């Protein structure tokens, strides 16, 4: 992290996690592997791929538009940790976005980043989780290390009084409220090396995609 980095102060009080008013220390830049071993109760389960939902094809059509990027999922372990285990059992790499003492304390409740170089059939499980506010999808052409640096930096935000807060941007309810309120500068800082954010909409029956253009924030619905 640059030595002169100052956490942005975009979200309002309702968009941050007030349970952690001190804010976490931003972890080291490199990715930290998670879920090195699968819990026995989960390892013994037979994970069944759901019937294909038409939304899966719509998601694939959207992300294929950015051929030079990789697709990732950020899973909120406090809402749907099973999605992280399913990803690992399907052969996807998963990394915790916390490290050190924080990673140990909330290993299965914090956010984790999953690389989806082969989106199918995992996206079928992702769509099946709609309504759980399980996390967000994103695309980036950055290296994994550079992406992790950015995703960790935007965890920490300041209020008007300079107090640090932990920003749960990977919660669909937060990001879809936050992004439309951003200025151009705030969008640039939040997007960083991310080219697209995707999360379920308020109905939990469709997705919304956001990209940043010269004209500002561009949103589009992903629905059947």
Predicted regions and their residues:
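Terminal low-complexity "docking" segments
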Residues: 5-11, 17-19, 23-167, 172-224
């Amino acid at each position: 992290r640059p030595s002169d980095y100052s956490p942005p102060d975009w979200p309002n009080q309702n968009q941050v996690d007030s349970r952690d008013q001190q804010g976490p220390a931003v972890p080291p830049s490199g990715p930290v592997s998670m879920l090195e071993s699968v819990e026995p109760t989960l390892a013994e389960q037979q994970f069944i791929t759901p019937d294909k939902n038409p939304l899966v094809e719509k998601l694939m059509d959207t992300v294929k538009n950015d051929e030079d990027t990789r697709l990732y999922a950020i899973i909120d372990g406090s809402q749907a940790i099973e999605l992280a285990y399913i990803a690992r059992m399907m052969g996807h790499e998963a990394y915790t976005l916390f490290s050190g003492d924080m990673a140990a304390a909330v290993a299965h409740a914090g956010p984790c980043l999953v690389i989806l170089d082969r989106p199918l059939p995992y996206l079928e499980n992702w769509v099946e989780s709609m309504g759980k506010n399980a996390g967000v999808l994103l695309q980036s052409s950055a290296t994994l290390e550079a992406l992790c640096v950015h995703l960790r930096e935007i965890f920490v935000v300041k209020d008007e009084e300079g107090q640090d807060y932990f920003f749960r941007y990977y919660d669909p309810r937060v990001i879809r409220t936050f992004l439309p309120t951003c200025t151009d500068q705030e969008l640039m800082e939040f997007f960083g090396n991310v080219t697209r954010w995707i999360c379920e909409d308020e109905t939990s029956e469709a997705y919304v995609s956001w990209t940043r253009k010269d004209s500002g924030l561009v949103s589009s619905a992903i629905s059947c």
